[in-house]
Amino acid sequence: MKKMMTFLKKAKVKAFTLVEMLVVLLIISVLFLLFVPNLTKQKEAVNDKGKAAVVKVVESQAELYSLEKNEDASLRKLQADGRITEEQAKAYKEYHDKNGGANRKVND
């Protein structure tokens, strides 16, 4: 019996308790909840800036088209002429739909 007690004392292993593990998981989950919404906001901001850049490209291509052809440019004409892609036209429409289209210079 004495040998068994000494063996158990020697075999005692240091480890984390369940409460400590739960506290760590709680802290990690709180940090996760704080950072994820910020990441989605940043992604939206980057997408908006990218679409704003596309708007400038489309408008400059429309101006060049108008100068060369002496007629008003439209998104369809610019696409048919190969000056912009379908994705650029879509981004142009989405940008103006989201921001109220008051300053829209190129029609469909």
Swiss-Prot record:
Disruption phenotype: ComGD, ComGF and ComGG are undetectable. Residues 1-13 form the signal peptide. InterPro entries: Bac_GSPG_pilin (IPR000983), ComGC (IPR016940), N_methyl_site (IPR012902), Pilin-like (IPR045584). The chain crosses the membrane at residues 16-36. NCBIfam families: IV_pilin_GFxxxE (TIGR02532), pilin_ComGC (NF040999). Belongs to the ComGC family. Major component of the type IV-like pilus (T4P) that plays a role in transformation. Transformation pili are dynamically extended and retracted, perhaps thereby promoting DNA uptake and transformation. Required for transformation. Required for DNA binding. This is Competence protein ComGC.
